[in-house]
Regions:
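Structural signature of tandem-repeat unit edges
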Residues: 1-3, 13-26, 36-49, 59-72, ...
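A structural signal for leucine-rich repeat
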Residues: 190-194
């Protein structure tokens, strides 16, 4: 077996754990969509792509490690995984898809690697437990509503590499205390930020 097909285990509500064999290179769209009891999944180093909505709605999934072999994560891949507390994003990934982690209300920390150049629309929308995020120097664009509704987010660092921030990227971040940014980048992006929260880098 080299792939897990689209919708393969959709709605298998009693499935608690899954170990994907080393022969698999791709996980299809909606492959484990709404496997409500799924608590753990082991993704082998052979996997290079995770499809759209692959684990969407897996509300019992608590942690996931995405191996370095993965180069693409589909839109909504982990959307509404409301028990997901941590995720390891590999250095091989270049973009975080639209709504990839939307509604992951238990997600507390996320490390975005230096390989990522874009953060998609609604990527972390409604991650209400997320407290801090550091955006690496590789990122050039942050999508619309990317961190909207992250009500526990206290600080964010925006590097000079960012050339565009979408509408409402940080709207509803009611706990936000500081946006760490250079003067130059702020002048370019100030229309999309909170002036009262700005802390300038040297």
């Amino acid at each position: 077996m080299t792939s897990i097909g689209n919708n393969a285990f959709w709605g298998c509500s009693s499935l608690q754990s899954v170990t994907i064999p080393d022969s698999v290179t791709s996980i299809g769209d909606d492959a484990f969509h709404e496997c409500l009891s799924l608590q753990s999944v082991t993704i082998p180093d052979s996997v290079t792509s995770i499809g759209d909505s692959a684990f969407s709605g897996c509300s019992s999934l608590q942690s996931v490690t995405i191996p370095d072999s993965v180069t693409s994560i589909g839109d909504r891949a982990f959307k509404d995984c409301s028990s997901l507390q941590s995720v390891a994003i590999p250095d091989s990934l270049t973009s975080i898809g639209d709504r990839a982690f939307q509604g992951c209300s238990s997600l507390q920390t996320v490390a975005i690697p230096d390989s990522v150049t874009s953060i998609g629309d609604d990527a972390f929308y409604g991650c209400s437990s997320l407290q801090s995020v550091t955006i690496p120097d590789s990122v050039t664009s942050i999508g619309d509503s990317a961190f909207m509704g992250c009500s526990s987010l206290q600080s964010v660092t925006i590097p000079d590499s960012v050339t565009s921030i979408g509408n409402k990227s940080f709207a509803g971040c009611k706990s936000l205390q500081s946006v760490i940014i250079s003067h130059q980048t702020y002048d370019r992006l100030k229309a999309k930020l909170y002036p009262s929260k700005i802390k300038f880098t040297e």
